[in-house]
Amino acid sequence: MDNGLAFRESMTQRTRAFALRVFKLCSSLPGTPESLHMRDQLFRCATSVAANYRASGRAKSDKDYLNKLKICEEESDEAEFWMDMLVACELVKRHKIEALMKEANELTAIITTSCITKRRNMKKSGGRKPA
């Protein structure tokens, strides 16, 4: 397996694991209307990161690939926002989800770098090279 495929597989598994960890967090939240709203938002973001990263592997073009990565970037950042809100609203202690928040931040950084690299490569090739 070449480095690109190994990286893609690693990130696919990592984003899936992130979504599963968020699921466990969401399952532990209280059932108040406010908590349910934040839970639903967080769960949608985390699962969107995993689903769109997986879908990026089947992109039909460079633009399609980049679009899916941009969705992942936005959703992982938003997931971190909702976790921060859970802490700010005192629904979860920060120390209990610090590692999960760090993972959201790291995923955002990795995906942002991938977007930058892809744009640079598209510019060099005139955007004609398939993803």
Residue spans for each PLM region:
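Short, C-terminally biased terminal segments at protein or domain edges
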Residues: 1-131
